Amino acid sequence: MGRTFIHASKIKHAARKRKHHSNFRTLIKLLNNDAYKIESSKPLKNGKLFKYWKNRRRLFSKIDSASIYMTDELWFSVTPERIACFLANFVKACMPNAERILDVFCGGGGNTIQFAMQFPYVYGVDYSIEHIYCTAKNAQSYGVDDRIWLKRGSWKKLVSKQKLSKIKYDCVFGSPPWGGPEYLRNDVYDLEQHLKPMGITKMLKSFLKLSPNVIMFLPRNSDLNQLSRATRKVLGPFAKCKVLYVKENGYMKGIFCMWGECFFNYEPASTENSRRESSEKEELSSENEELSKRKKHESTTTTKDNTVDIYDVNG
């Protein structure tokens, strides 16, 4: 999709200007057909997505009042709005002077939009032109398309060809494909074998090429031993990863894994978000397979190789 990012507010103009490229021709068709627009009151034809449709307002709170666009895949891959909002506020608290955020697998724009609520320059990358289209349309519905720039491309190719390195990013975020709902079939999620488009070690290394501050949203059953090994292999034997277990409506949704000094050296009690969000403390078992010993107040605990917190985004 060209060498540069496309401003989300000018995506139609950019598509027409570059219509000789196949991806832009596809984009023009999507725009002309108003494709993938969700009718909030009408259940989806795909019955397998019904449980996600029931929770549609958790994905996008404006789904009843504004135009929201999602492909079938995005129904189970978009970060719920409260969780995306929590993360954006958390990053803002840790990096109050940050300006530029890169969202590597932007999907339908769940995280991209919330980052744009907090930061003036947000860049979204995705392999799918349909996802780029959905992000742009959803950003328009939330009124933040003037803060978002988008680019279609394979993450492997973009990194290997250094097509993103001209911009200095304050933080790189990514919610890489987990492999669909099937990720919960195993008790422990293999971060080297099942994470796409590459294992956790290569993924971390590729993100760190663009910024020393990195965040990934990973499955709640991720193998934390693999996470520790990847951290030490890429950053050295004494490096640690900050892990935030995130709950919504009493259910664990996933973990935010963070690398960068700013995520360790911050004062949570001083932020509006932290006053609003309640959190609990839980210890990881030696096998990292179960959480226990819950407490009501926010605290931080360290395992051998990671720092672990748990937050409930509902307060």
UniProtKB/Swiss-Prot annotation:
Effect noted on mutating residue 175 to E/R:
Loss of function
A Pfam short name: Methyltransf_15
What are its E.C. numbers? 2.1.1.-
A GO BP entry: meiotic cell cycle
Q: Where in the cell is it found?
A: Nucleus, Nucleolus
Q: Where is this region: Required for correct nucleolar localization?
A: 1-58
GO CC list: nucleolus; nucleus
Q: Does the keyword Nucleus apply?
A: yes
Extract the CDD domains matched here. AdoMet_MTases (cd02440)
Q: Where is it chiefly localized?
A: nucleus
Q: What is the effect of changing residue 83 to R?
A: Loss of function
Q: Which residues form a coiled coil?
A: none
Region of interest (Disordered), ranges: 271-315
**Catalytic reactions of this protein:** a 5'-end (N(7)-methyl 5'-triphosphoguanosine)-ribonucleoside in snRNA + S-adenosyl-L-methionine = a 5'-end (N(2),N(7)-dimethyl 5'-triphosphoguanosine)-ribonucleoside in snRNA + S-adenosyl-L-homocysteine + H(+); a 5'-end (N(7)-methyl 5'-triphosphoguanosine)-ribonucleoside in snoRNA + S-adenosyl-L-methionine = a 5'-end (N(2),N(7)-dimethyl 5'-triphosphoguanosine)-ribonucleoside in snoRNA + S-adenosyl-L-homocysteine + H(+); a 5'-end (N(2),N(7)-dimethyl 5'-triphosphoguanosine)-ribonucleoside in snRNA + S-adenosyl-L-methionine = a 5'-end (N(2),N(2),N(7)-trimethyl 5'-triphosphoguanosine)-ribonucleoside in snRNA + S-adenosyl-L-homocysteine + H(+); a 5'-end (N(2),N(7)-dimethyl 5'-triphosphoguanosine)-ribonucleoside in snoRNA + S-adenosyl-L-methionine = a 5'-end (N(2),N(2),N(7)-trimethyl 5'-triphosphoguanosine)-ribonucleoside in snoRNA + S-adenosyl-L-homocysteine + H(+)
Q: Which UniProt keywords apply?
A: Methyltransferase, Nucleus, S-adenosyl-L-methionine, Transferase
Q: What does this protein do?
A: Catalyzes the two serial methylation steps for the conversion of the 7-monomethylguanosine (m(7)G) caps of snRNAs and snoRNAs to a 2,2,7-trimethylguanosine (m(2,2,7)G) cap structure. The enzyme is specific for guanine, and N7 methylation must precede N2 methylation. Hypermethylates the m3G cap on TLC1 telomerase which affects telomere silencing and telomere length regulation. Required for pre-mRNA splicing, pre-rRNA processing and small ribosomal subunit synthesis. Involved in nucleolar structural organization.
* Summary of subunit composition and partner proteins: Monomer. Interacts with the spliceosomal snRNP core component SMB1 and the snoRNP components CBF5 and NOP58.
Q: Which family does it belong to?
A: Belongs to the methyltransferase superfamily. Trimethylguanosine synthase family.
* Name of the molecule in the record: Trimethylguanosine synthase
Q: Which organism is it from?
A: Saccharomyces cerevisiae (strain ATCC 204508 / S288c)
